[in-house]
Structures are given as structure tokens and as C-alpha cells.
Amino acid sequence: MSLHIADHPLVKHKLGLMRQNDISTKDFRALASEIARLLTYEAVKDLPTEKHIVDGWAGPVEVDRLKGKKITIVPILRAGLGMMDGVIDLIPSAKVTVVGFYRDEETLEPVEYYVKTASEMSERVALIIDPMLATGGTLIATIDTLKKAGSKKIKGLFLVAAPEGIKKVQDAHPDVEIYVAAVDERLNEAGYILPGLGDAGDKIFGTR
């Protein structure tokens, strides 16, 4: 697995604002979208292009166009929806695949409750988006689901990640690339990232 940690002053500044405990829902939501946009820019640098001839103002001109099927964005419900706008801003023609999991209270393992994939998944780059990569369990389950649907190239975009989760995903799916704004210190006993952002879903949807 390739791990890409954003090294950009704008990302660091915006993430710092998100760490404030008294941040408003409006600001948290806006910053999540803005960082998602910046992470997307990095994550799609290797997309293939092909040459096309178009009618320019002074005659025919050769231009680059993206090659192949459109990307599919994969928000993990519910918090992943908070990063959607930032990704869609850059890739407005992207298809959307939606996955949802809940945690079994006895086994603590993720249980799939909703999946709706785009068509021809084997021909699309899949961009998983979720604010937090904590234990890695939900991400691994999501990757498993996408691979069963035919996905061959998968990338994940996260605001913050814990070393424990990164290691777990790396062991399970070494072919998946991870793009993250920051790698934090550790997980606490309850599985929350420290220092982290708190409950990103609650902050995005105003349900805290």
C-alpha cells in the first residue's frame, strides 16, 4: 500500500481549524469539502489521458482528455457524504457508488447494510472517501465489497488516520493507495483517533 500524506500549507491550516472543539457545523462541513478537493487533486494525478482534436478559435488544436470510464466516488455512509462536494467539484462527471456498514455490538465487526455500485466497476478507478481511518475495519470491508464488484484500482481519501488502521489496511490490501491530510498519534480505548476530530459524522450533520 502506498501512503500519501498531504504536505501542503493549505491542508495543514484547514485541518487545524477543523480540530477546534467549538467549530460550527457550517465551518466543519465546508472545511471537510475543501480538504477533500485538495486530496482529490493529488489522488488523480496518474489518470491516463489521450489526444483529441477540437475546433479552437484559430483552427484545429490538439488537446488532452481523460481516457477510459469515469471515476466512481465511494462515500462510506454517513460521514463520507460530507466530502462528496469537494470531489464532485473536480470530477463533476464521476459516477457514485454508495456503501453503508454498521458495527455488530457483539463481534465489533462491520456489517454491510447497503451497497449500490456503479456499472462496469472493473473499468473504473474507485475513490473511497471517509473523514476518518481509525481501526481500518470498515475500510477493509468496503474494499472487499468493491473488489467483489470487480474493482481493480482503488484509492482512499481521508482527513485523518491512525497508525493502527493504516497498518491493518496495508496488511489486508497492499495494492490500495491511501491519501490522508494527517496521520495522528493513536487510537484510544474506544477506537477514536487521538487527537483526531471527534465524531466527524455528528459534526458534519449537526447531530452532536
Swiss-Prot record:
SUPFAM superfamilies: PRTase-like. One of its GO terms (biological process) is uracil salvage. Binds 1 Mg(2+) ion per subunit. The magnesium is bound as Mg-PRPP. The keyword GTP-binding applies. The keyword Transcription regulation does not apply. Uracil binds at I193, G198, D199, A200. Transmembrane segments: none annotated. It catalyses: UMP + diphosphate = 5-phospho-alpha-D-ribose 1-diphosphate + uracil. Its cofactor is Mg(2+). Its EC number is 2.4.2.9. Catalyzes the conversion of uracil and 5-phospho-alpha-D-ribose 1-diphosphate (PRPP) to UMP and diphosphate. Belongs to the UPRTase family. This is Uracil phosphoribosyltransferase.
